[in-house]
């Protein structure tokens, strides 16, 4: 298979972890007989320094010409004096919009070898944590209108509007059901249908989409307040969670932090037919940039998500994930996941160790 991939290294540790991600992709290409073409482009602070714009038009065009986009990290204190659309983070928001990415897939998996990092009770951890939160990215209360502030009865009053139409719900539901087919085949749709009209429509459309298109997948529904509790009470009950923008923002962060190893977690943002964007959920860590201390595993696991979701290469994705697990089982650790008895290695060595096991 021929693959065109755009690389957005970004800022801080971005170039270091990107290097390891690319090496893994090159190893996969060599061992499985694929051809990969890489294009580099600027985003975030690096783009500001070079062009004055956190998202140059050339970057947008390069991403649109690719089949998938791999992102390192964006932002850092050297650009803290900038505001709004001038900030590095505006580049990330801009590329998501330019590519029409409406679905964010964030897996929260606890590797057994890192169980000691999890703050949940040992009996809960023993059941395993492997949750995928599918969050709608472009609708809901963050983008609904009207929104703003005005004076009512002499009082400052602010307001936002939560809005979803049936097609927005249907397309995110399809992403969740398709993801579940690649996993354990279970979807839990999270809403607040006992209070919100928008959630009642959400539940109705998710249920209909399940019946019409995905009867082989198990579907359940849960109110968001209960879901937030159940995630810490027994995360093993969940496979794929699908929910709207606001609830997904909260639940995906909750799901990621309960693993205790945020430096291990990848993510994917997908649209309708165009290139997907794959990135680690951690930040740019400027305090350790250029010191060979960064953990590249979240980026490497993001390449596995790319292979699976952009190219349909399940065997190759599993090979990458299996290699990561073997390295952890052998006791190798970067500083952020170091535990008693582990062997401390740097970013480059960790990448080498994974490559050797693919």
From Swiss-Prot:
User: Which cofactors are named for this entry?
Assistant: Mg(2+); Mn(2+)
Provide the residue positions that the database annotates as binding Mg(2+): 225, 249, 253
Residues reported in the UniProt entry to bind substrate: 96, 106, 135, 225
**Residues noted as binding NAD(+) in the record, renumbered to the chain:** 76-89, 283-295
User: Which of the seven top EC classes does this enzyme belong to?
Assistant: oxidoreductase
Site feature location: Important for catalysis: 142, 192
Parts forming coiled coils:
none
**Where's it found, cell-wise?**
Cytoplasm
- Does Transcription regulation appear among the keywords? no
Q: How is the cofactor bound?
A: Binds 1 Mg(2+) or Mn(2+) ion per subunit.
Give the matching Pfam families: Iso_dh
Catalysed reactions, as listed in the record: (2R,3S)-3-isopropylmalate + NAD(+) = 4-methyl-2-oxopentanoate + CO2 + NADH
Q: Which GO terms describe its cellular component?
A: cytosol
Q: GO: which molecular function terms?
A: 3-isopropylmalate dehydrogenase activity; magnesium ion binding; NAD binding
Keyword annotations for this protein, in alphabetical order, are: Amino-acid biosynthesis, Branched-chain amino acid biosynthesis, Cytoplasm, Leucine biosynthesis, Magnesium, Manganese, Metal-binding, NAD, Oxidoreductase
The record's annotation in Gene3D superfamilies points to: Isopropylmalate Dehydrogenase
Note the PROSITE patterns from the entry: IDH_IMDH
Q: In which pathway does it act?
A: Amino-acid biosynthesis; L-leucine biosynthesis; L-leucine from 3-methyl-2-oxobutanoate: step 3/4
Quick check: keyword NAD in the entry?
Answer: yes
Q: Which GO terms describe its biological process?
A: L-leucine biosynthetic process
EC number(s) of the enzyme? 1.1.1.85
Q: Which family does it belong to?
A: Belongs to the isocitrate and isopropylmalate dehydrogenases family. LeuB type 1 subfamily.
Physiological role: Catalyzes the oxidation of 3-carboxy-2-hydroxy-4-methylpentanoate (3-isopropylmalate) to 3-carboxy-4-methyl-2-oxopentanoate. The product decarboxylates to 4-methyl-2 oxopentanoate.
Q: Give the NCBIfam families listed for this entry.
A: leuB
Q: How does it assemble?
A: Homodimer.
**Protein's UniProt name:** 3-isopropylmalate dehydrogenase
Question: What is the protein's species of origin?
Answer: Oleidesulfovibrio alaskensis (strain ATCC BAA-1058 / DSM 17464 / G20) (Desulfovibrio alaskensis)
